[in-house]
Amino acid sequence: MFFAASKIFWLFVQPISLLLAGLLVSILAIALGWWRLGLAFSSITTVLLALAGFTTLGNIMLLPLEDRFTRPALPARIDGIVVLGGYMEGEINASRGGHEVNGAADRIIETMRLARHYPEARIVVSGGEGTFFEDSVPDAISTRALFRDFSLTGDRLFFEDRSRNTYENAVYSREMVKPQPGETWLLVTSAFHMPRSVGCFRQAGFPVIAWPVDYSTRPDRHFTIDLQNPLGNLTQVTIAMREWLGLAAYWFSGKIGEVLPAPGGVSVVGG
C-alpha cells in the first residue's frame, strides 16, 4: 500500500507535474475570463520554472543531504557491504537485455572496488523491481550477470531482489545476511540518498557505516543564476524534492526515527 501510494503521490507532485498543472490552470482561467487568476498562475509558473531551470536552487536543496554523512577512512577490516539498487536502467534491460547503467553507476563501481579491497567481505546487492507502470529487471538480477562477466562470483555474494523501496532494502537485506552484534558493514548508496537509507537500516536493526558515493553538488556553489545547464538544474531540483518528501513520508510512517537522520544514531534492537 505504501509503495503504490508513494508512486502515485509523486506522479502528481513532481516539479514537472506541478508546472504543467499551473500552466493548465492559467489557460483555463483565461478561457473562462478570469484574467487576474490566469495571470497570477502563469506568473507563478514562470517564476518557478525559472528558479528550477536557470538557477542553482537544486544544488542548494541537495547540499544538506549530500553533506549529512561524510565518507570515513577505510576500516582495517569489514564483515560486509550492502549496495542499494537504483543504478541500472531496469526497463531498458527488460526490453533489450544486457545491463545498462545510469548516472548512479558510482554505487556499483565503488562496491566492486571495495570487494577487491576486502576479498573476505560479504556483498549484498539490494534492489528489486521498484517500477510501478512498466516491466523492469531488478538491479540485483542485472548485477548478478554483471559480476559474472567480471569473474566476481562465490558464496560471499548475496542478491536481494524483492525490495521495492529503501525501507524494504533494509528489512530484506537484514533478513538475508542476519548481521551479528559487533560486525562492521558498509552501506553504499548515492550521497543524497544516504540520510534516508541510514535511517531505514537503523530502524530495521541493521547498524551500518555510511559510504556515500555519486555526489552531484559543489559545496562552494552558492545561489546564483545558471544559464548553461537548465535540464541538469531542473533534474537536481526534482531529485532534491523527491528526497525531502521521501524523508518526511518515511518519518511520518515510522520507517525512520528522525526527519533527517544524522551520524551517531542508534539502531533499533531486533528491527
What are the residue ranges of the model-derived segments?
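Membrane-embedded alpha-helical segments of integral membrane proteins
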Residues: 1-30
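A structural signal for short, hydrophobic/glycine-enriched beta-strand patches
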Residues: 50-237
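Transmembrane helix-loop junctions in multipass membrane proteins, especially transporters and channels
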Residues: 35, 64-68, 254-262
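Extracytoplasmic/luminal low-complexity segments enriched in Pro/Gly and acidic/polar residues
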Residues: 223-228, 235-271
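Internal alpha-helical transmembrane segments
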Residues: 40-51
